[in-house]
Design a protein with these regions (language model features):
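Conserved catalytic-core motifs of eukaryotic protein kinase domains, centered on the activation segment
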Residues: 125-127
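Class I (Rossmann-like) S-adenosyl-L-methionine-dependent methyltransferase catalytic domain
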Residues: 1-46, 57-70, 75-93, 99-104, ...
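A conserved beta-strand element that flanks and buttresses the S-adenosyl-L-methionine
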Residues: 115
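A short glycine-rich, Lys/Arg-flanked "PGG" loop and its adjoining helix->strand segment in the class I
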Residues: 130-142
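Conserved beta-strand/loop positions that form the S-adenosyl-L-methionine
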Residues: 54
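Short catalytic micro-motifs in class I SAM-dependent methyltransferases
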Residues: 118-122
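Local beta-strand N-terminus motif with an aromatic residue
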Residues: 111-112
């Protein structure tokens, strides 16, 4: 069976870490991420409550949520990312992580809240996005909140048609997802910059109405839509606060 296109993130993690970088994604020291999570936890009374993170990456949110007193469970399809996050979270007894395909693997337990940090936009086909969002919705207890943080966003010009495959998306965008490109990654240990060649990975941005329609079709209630300032993590993004 052909592996899913979003396994490109596993290949990227492997390449970046083998080049000597310690961190690719968010850091627990990201002030915007920390302050957003702190406010979200406090407003929803999530201390000592269970939170699942989809596409948890290297565990930055896990550290922050653990420090805020939450019971954390992170999942990601990348074994390399899970290895990194497990090491980062080893001193937090209420934090666990596991390899899981958030599109295909169902979540058996019900959680008090959920978070997705730059995860949804990794999915480009309509079917994968719908399957994942339904999975996330069904993992939540009634009236539980979910935060989609820094999802790729454009005010206009996004593709509103149906996308059925990664090949179809590549034709629509004209982007090259095969040729490695030079990227610079700041090493978390000593602050030096590591240069690495990695291909562009597929990502699908939506406008405000596109996101709202997508969430409401699953059953989520939209509480807040926030356009984020540009960051080194992603230039154009939005954070969407929803509730089951």
């Amino acid at each position: 069976m052909k592996e899913p296109y979003y396994m490109a993130y596993e290949k990227r993690y492997q390449t970046v870490f083998s080049a000597g970088a310690e961190c690719w994604g968010h850091s627990p020291n990201d002030d915007v991420l920390y302050n957003t999570l702190k406010t979200w936890v406090e407003e929803n009374n999530l201390k000592c409550k269970s939170i699942i993170e989809f596409a948890c990456g290297e565990g930055a949110c896990g550290v922050i949520l653990s420090e805020l007193g939450c019971v954390y469970y992170g999942v990601d399809i990348s074994p390399t990312a899970i290895m990194k996050s497990r090491k980062l979270l080893e001193n937090y007894p209420n934090a666990t992580v596991e390899v899981l395909d958030m599109v295909k693997d169902k979540i058996d337990k019900k959680f008090d809240a959920a978070i997705d940090c730059m995860g949804l936009h990794m999915l480009i086909t309509d079917g994968d996005r719908k399957s994942y969002l339904a999975n996330a919705y069904n993992s939540l207890k009634d009236n539980a909140p979910m935060l989609f943080f820094r999802e790729s966003y454009r005010e206009s010009g996004t593709y509103r048609g149906v996308v059925n495959s990664a090949d179809e998306w590549a034709k629509i965008t004209g982007d090259d997802y095969n040729t490695p490109q030079l990227r610079q990654v700041r090493n978390a240990k000593d602050g030096s910059v590591v240069e690495v060649y990695v291909p562009l990975v597929p990502a699908r941005a939506k406008d405000k109405n596109g996101y709202i329609e997508e969430f409401e079709n699953i059953g989520f209630k939209i509480e807040k839509f926030v356009c984020m300032e540009d960051s080194t993590a992603i230039p154009y993004s939005a954070s969407i606060f929803v509730r089951k």
